[in-house]
Amino acid sequence: IMNNIYEDIAKRTQGDIYIGVVGPVRTGKSTFIRRFMETLVLPNIENDFKRERTKDEIPQSGSGRTIMTVEPKFVPADGVEIKIKDTVSLKVRMVDCVGYIVDGALGHEEDGKQRLVSTPWSKEAMTFEKAAEIGTKKVIKDHSTIGIVIITDGSVTGIERSSYIIPEERVIKELKSLKKPFAVVLNTKHPNSEDTKFLRKDLEEKYDVPIIPMDVDKMDEEDIEEVMETVLYDFPLGEIGRASCRERV
């Protein structure tokens, strides 16, 4: 079954799986990219040199409240060919986004003012908040064939769930308006708890999209498959090849 999922996605994206990973800060976006690369991408890169180089480009991820990603990062820089189960060839690249700011997160301010960050989309440095906003739109619209939104119940960072709600609403609304296929991952230390089941149900009703709860730090091949299958179902039926990707910053 796994091959079929990747084969179907490859047909719909001309073989380019460019994944924009977006969401509020401190939800686990860099961790998702690291696990995805370690689990699905690195083992399927045939060229040793490219495998090592790709490994070096995987973003740092950390626990706690401090923001790790302060500028958008393409991982790997030019996309890399992988072959799944020796049958499906794909070109994969992920984009780690600057997230929308969450109350309680640290690292986006200096001397009480918002930090200025540099981005590929502007010669001028811009505030963290603006970088998150422009970056999310740009990454999904121009540099992704599919989107993954990472949200959390707060158990992975110790930041209150309530602090995440407004930025989470913004990012999901943004993705819906951009009309790219996407999936929503709920990052939690307790994916199978009753509380998580209730939260999932609430969020699915609120956003009208499937929510996949998992502990992203422990994400395995089966979890990735579930995410990709959810994305696949979000492609419009019969619109094979529509999700083309403009390669310009």
Predicted regions and their residues:
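Inter-motif core of Ras-like GTPase G domains
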Residues: 105-158, 174
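Conserved NTP-handling cores and scaffolds of large molecular machines
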Residues: 40, 44-52, 101-105, 140, ...
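Canonical P-loop GTPase G-domain recognition
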Residues: 170-183, 188-246
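Conserved G1/Walker A P-loop phosphate-binding module
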Residues: 1-123, 141
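Conserved nucleotide-binding/hydrolysis micro-motifs of P-loop NTPases
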Residues: 98-102, 153-156, 189-192, 217-220
